[in-house]
Curated annotation (Swiss-Prot):
Record's subunit section: Homodimer. The ends of the coiled-coil dimer bind to each other, forming polymers. Interacts with FtsZ.
Main subcellular location of this protein, as a coarse class: cytoplasm
Domain of life: Bacteria
Subcellular localization, as worded in the UniProt entry: Cytoplasm
Species the sequence originates in: Shewanella oneidensis (strain ATCC 700550 / JCM 31522 / CIP 106686 / LMG 19005 / NCIMB 14063 / MR-1)
One GO biological process term: division septum assembly
Role played: Non-essential, abundant cell division factor that is required for proper Z-ring formation. It is recruited early to the divisome by direct interaction with FtsZ, stimulating Z-ring assembly and thereby promoting cell division earlier in the cell cycle. Its recruitment to the Z-ring requires functional FtsA or ZipA.
Taxonomic lineage: Bacteria, Pseudomonadati, Pseudomonadota, Gammaproteobacteria, Alteromonadales
Coiled-coil intervals, chain numbering: 3-66
The name this protein goes by in its record: Cell division protein ZapB
Amino acid sequence: MSLELLSKLETKIQATLETIELLKMELEEEKQKTSTLSEQNNQLIEQNQQLQQELTSWNEKVTGLVGLLNSEI
């Protein structure tokens, strides 16, 4: 192989290695984003469950009050 071909090959290899490093960094960023979104999702699920429990409790209270009003009328 000529020196020129070796130089071109070296340049291509270097560019490929740089691309691989950039992709590794992007992958790590995406993993971090996924982790953050997963945590937020879990928090929202817990909050939703709490709100559903509160809604059920309020519905029971309102139903009880309506029952009391109906029995007094």
